[in-house]
Structures are given as structure tokens and as C-alpha cells.
């Protein structure tokens, strides 16, 4: 290869908001850090039928409009998507089937891109970076003799689980059993044995367990795995993979990658209302409650949270989703007279500018669903967390934060709303009090890990991991030429 700056990287994200926003930030990080070694990053964006595409694409384009070296290419939709009923019943099965249907579209897009690069002769595609849900697309990389790297928008602990699943499956060829909830699993990278009850709910049903295993079995085929975490946060997990005896890909701890922009469908007037209210509150006086973008709270659970907030009597911002078929707005789901009683105490909203809220000096605690992006954002701003996981790998994240790292306060570790599980008002109120008191999880400890994250990115371990990844990528292009 004649010039170092002639390398192009192709990134293929998964279109859930947390995944695609982290991907955009990853691309910016690679461009800002590598100087001229990467000429261009091309993001091949594809959508899902139930995600409004026009608004999403416009928002994503706005995020990269000042980044001339980042190109966003939108791909056509799958013509015969899996039935929506499959997503409702077995989300992981739907996701894997949809990704497989995207493979021919990705192949055509990549073929077109490679042909244009061959004609110009000035830029060479160095490799692919795939969201971990997109690992079936490793086959496309192999067809074009391109190395595939995985971008894991989760923790090193989650990576340990993905290594563990195929190993367990070779011995026990069936899904996990909820009746063995207290069974302990020796997951790589964990100091503590991990109880079955905190594993992703999809591992307990055959229809969704098999896609998890199929994805995990493809991980060793990658050239390397970029993990959105850092060594100071998960030292044991990364130490394990550093000395991993198996033929496993190189691990690059490149986090924290923080999503600096909130989701596209936030009303700007609502954002202004929330931030203006926060500006008037004392430092560290507000608890922020937010439960993610995919789960609706039941009416019973909403009532219990409302009672708890009245009991605890501290300032709050409470963001939650409701079923639009049942309620036109979150206010309709609240107990009668609740807003009148807490008029001076807090704000209720359906959507909130999470990054801005967590960054605000008035916020002193976060009751979180424990999505990994949310955990990194909260830690990044030094805000203590109380764990209330809802779905996917969030129970495992909560276990990691509470039991493994001692960086969060336990509300619940194994909450499963589908089982009719309800957290009572007294329990919620007690946890919120403890969170805001800062005794069980001192704010100083969270601040220390926040500083460690900043240092990792600013010339420290994560900076060096990105540098090593770029070097490996460019060297691979030079060798293959």
C-alpha cells in the first residue's frame, strides 16, 4: 500500500438507537484519533420495519454532517421481512432472521463500494466492523477477503457470557431453566459465580436461546472485538481475555464511548422545560428515573413508583413509556391527583434528554434499567446508580455493577415484568433514599471511576487500544496487498 491514509473502514451497525448512536461515536473516535491513517469510514445503515426511517436517517445525517471523512450510506429494506409477531414473541429470533435476510443486500452494497475503490485506485477498504448482532455478515467479509471485527456495545462481562454459551451448549444442548434460578455459572472474567436468574431472559426459551448460541458461536471467527468498556472499570474481565488460552480474537477495550446526542424524537420544548427546571434545583438533589425505550411499565407498577416518590419526598425527574394504545401520554397513566400533589417536587415525561440530565449538577442519583450505554453515561458523569433491569442483558449488567464491581445500589437484579413482578412502593422509596444519601455507594467512588474513564480515553488504556486496532487494521491491508 503506497500511502497510509488510503485505508477505508466499513462499519455495519444494528439499527436499535443505542447501537447506532454508539456506532456514530465510535466512527468519530477513530477519525479523531488516527490522524490520516484512515481515509474514510463508511457506515452502511439499514433499518427495521417498525423504526421510522425518514426521521432516523435525517437525525443520523445531522450527527455526521461536520465529519467529511464519515459517510452514511442508507441501504434498501428487506422485501420479505419476518412477521412482526415473531419480534413480539421471540425478539432474538426475529433479529437473527432479519440480519440473515440483510446479507445479500450488504453483499451488493459492499461489492459496489469495492468496485468503485478499485477503479479509483487511491483508497482501499481495510476491513469491516460489525455490530455483534450482525456477525452472520462475517461471511460477506470472507467472500471479499476482508477481515471482520466485532463492535460490542456491551460490557466485558457480556463478552464473557458470549464465550461461555457455546462451551455450555456443547455439554448441555438446551436452554437454561428458570426453576434452577440459583444455579451458579462460572462465566469467564467474573470473580463471582453468576446466578442463572440474572442471565438474559432470551436464554430461557428454546426459540430465543438458539439464536443467542448461534451468534456467540460466530465470535471466534472475528479478527478482533472492540468492547465499549475500559480496563479500570472491568479489570478482571479484560485480564481474563488478555491471557485467554483459547484461540479467541484480540480484544480491544476502547470505552467509554459515550453517546453525546440524545435520540431524535425528543420535543425541543420538552427538553427546554426539563433543563430549565433542573437549573433551579440544588446540586445533587434530584433523582432521575428512566427505564429505557423498549419496555412499557404496567399500570400497577406506575402506581407503586408514584407512591414511592410521594413517600420519599425528594426532587425527581421520572421518564417512562406507556402503551400508546392505552394512554395518549404518561400523565394519563398516573394516579388521580398525583401531579397536583408533587407539583413543586418533580417532572414526569415520556421522553427525556438523558445525557443532558445526567450531566447536570442538580442530579444526584439515577434509577436505571441498566442498559450498558446508560450505565456508561451515568458513570461518566459521576452519578450513582440504583439498578432496575428490564430486559435483554440488563439483569447481567445490574449483577456486574452491584455484585462484581460494587458501583451500584441494588433495587432489583432479576426483575422480570413479564412474570407479573411488581416492586412495591416502600422498597422503591427505601432504595431511592439510600441512593441519594450516598452511604452504600459513595459518590466519591463513582467519581473515581468516572475520572478513570476520562483518563483511559485521553491518552490512557482505551486510547492505546484504539491505536493498536488501527495499526492492526492498516498492517493487515499492507500485508494483503
Swiss-Prot record:
Pfam families, from UniProt? UDPGT
Enzyme Commission number(s) of this protein? 2.4.1.91, 2.4.1.237
Catalysed reaction equations from the record: a flavonol + UDP-alpha-D-glucose = a flavonol 3-O-beta-D-glucoside + UDP + H(+); a 7-O-hydroxy-flavonol + UDP-alpha-D-glucose = a flavonol 7-O-beta-D-glucoside + UDP + H(+)
Enzymatic class: transferase
Annotated PROSITE patterns: UDPGT (PS00375)
Where does this protein hold UDP-alpha-D-glucose?
153, 352, 354, 369, 372-374, 377, 393-394
Q: Which InterPro entries match?
A: UDP-glycosyltransf_plant, UDP_glucos_trans, UDP_glycos_trans_CS
* Origin superkingdom: Eukaryota
Residues reported in the UniProt entry to bind an anthocyanidin: 19, 392
Q: Which residues form the active site?
A: 19 (proton acceptor), 131 (charge relay)
Q: Which UniProt keywords apply?
A: Glycosyltransferase, Transferase
**MF-aspect GO terms:** flavonol 3-O-glucosyltransferase activity; flavonol 7-O-beta-glucosyltransferase activity; quercetin 3'-O-glucosyltransferase activity; quercetin 7-O-glucosyltransferase activity; UDP-glucosyltransferase activity
Q: What job does this protein perform?
A: Possesses quercetin 7-O-glucosyltransferase and 3'-O-glucosyltransferase activities in vitro. Also active in vitro on benzoates and benzoate derivatives. Glucosylates other secondary metabolites in vitro like trans-resveratrol, curcumin, vanillin and etoposide.
Q: Could you say which protein family the record assigns here?
A: Belongs to the UDP-glycosyltransferase family.
Q: How is this protein named in the record?
A: Flavonol 3-O-glucosyltransferase UGT71C1
Q: Which gene encodes it?
A: UGT71C1
